[in-house]
Amino acid sequence: MGGGSALSLAVCLVLAVLAPAVSGDGATLESVPDLVKAMYLNIESFPCVRLLNLSGEIGCSNPGSEKIIAPIVRLTKGSDQLVQPSTVLLPSDQMSDFFLRVSNDPEFHQKVSGVLIESNGANNNLQELSPDGKFPQDAFAPYSNRSHNWNPAGSGIMWNRYDFPVFLLSEESTRVLQKVSEKNKKTDNGYKANVAEFDLVMQTTKAQTHDSASCLKERSCLPLGGHSVWASLPPIKNGSTEHQKPIVLAITSQDSASFFRDRSIGSDSPISGLIALLTAVDALSHIHDLRNLKKQLVFAVFNGEAWGYLGSRKFLQELDKGADSVNGINSLMIDQVVEIGSVGKAVIEKYPSFYVHAAGNSSASNKILDALQSASKSLGSDNVKVKQAASSNPGVPPSSLMSFIRKNMSTSGVVLEDFDSHFSNRFYHSYLDNPAAAALVARSLYILASANSVVDLMTLNTIKVNVSLVEELIGCLLTCKPGLSCGLVKSFISPSSTSCPSHYVGVFLDDPSGTQFPSYADDTSRFVWNFLADKTSTLAGNKSSCTGKCGDEGEVCVGAEVEGGGRCVVSTTRYVPAYSTRVKFEDNAWHVLPANSSDPMGVVDPVWTESYWNTIGLRVYAVQDSTFDWLILLAGLSITAASYCAVHVGRAYISKVVKRD
């Protein structure tokens, strides 16, 4: 009894010593969860994860299967040194220089246990930041000159492998960690330090599968992919001969490459093209004589373009196969291709200027340029300029159009961009804050669909862009508030995430056979499908609500996810799987296919995959120096020994007194 009391007394004394150090703010600890909450601070952050291809790995991971724990040190200059293995807190403007140093300085690399990148917040003072290469995805270019610097600011750091965890902090977490690092600096060589604990253990690391072929075989990864969407305006009938018109195909991308999985640092520029296309479709949907045009308008939004042009290549493969996902169109019907690239930066100038990058110098491509210039003139006082890109360029810039050209070198197409020879957006963070691009695209498509017939100028001048829609799409797709919780998105779908929009393609989770009713499609793809289905539709005869399939052929259910159900409309809008043409889903698993010499883009396809993981976590807490721990232990043992002696002496004294009595 006496020994147990002594031990309890010792524990109480030790807790009394430690409690103030743990809580830090004098808060009352009433339970074990309170104690844990006071000791450990979970940090809101966005990870860089492990990606694999046929030749190896890129991205980030813990080096083994254990958590990483290291003190937090803030570096403000690229030349700063580390005296011990540390968690590096880094301003975002130092990111490129830091990772280049890590790759080139093995001694410095050994002292980097983990990296935390500060959020820039609203005060974006970055001069340039592009983790991509100087010629993104140059292996897919349909020309031999791969030395052209389309992206002069490109550092290429996102294509390297890092055997330490890297996280991007939220704005609030950035402020917290800056204070923590200051405390560490002030108590340098003291008995207490604040450390970061990283849980970024990748399944491919544990399974020792270090390329896409082996990890797919061992099922420690999944292929990158998602769903593209296409729609026709007006709707076309399956198997009918009346719609066999040449197709004017307007395309854009919905994804972008980023160093971090769930948050893009300055890589949203392709989304300006998506916003322009959606707004152009809305403008054209109000025209009533579209069935009388000589050509059929078709719109396609490709997913996975930043990772080997997954969406556009799979779309073309589906056309070749005559798959259900492209029922109603075929590749021979595609007459002209107009791609809307990054168009957000053009509006910075007083008079927006757009550059037309043509595939070759064919008469058909020149007709697209003529249509764009005619549309520009029709806008009158809006002063939108359309210029032909420099003839010194090696060809079209990195774009989905490359897939079409590599498939058919005689493809007539152009890419509309806000730059001439080099990306104008040095830190990849452009927003479309002017309806000029959407108006230009909408009118150009109308002119192209009119073919050689006389354009109805009265109708052309009625094609106007809804400025409020542009602003709403920016808020939904490019900002955190409201983000995908905006009213427009929620009128069509029930978003699975209320956090900031992510433009990372993700992994392909479905069995690809169920394309038109996928069990999983990301929020952006589902929104785009519903938006296009709505804007390109005519009302169905049956106006009852729906929650999935509609009864009549040619009908689709728009807004099926919203409360109260959706509505059936007549629309030709379909999902198309977007994943590598070099992988196949068979026997409930993914397999890498051998390269086919007839598919030049497939030959150079890296076949990107993403590792599985169990949990991803980042938390911060204070730890004592080991010397202090030994002192605490010694103090505890001393107290225990003293208590034992006191009890022993006390017992002897009491026994002696009792005997006297």
Mark where each language-model region is.
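Secretory-pathway/membrane protein signature
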Residues: 1-661
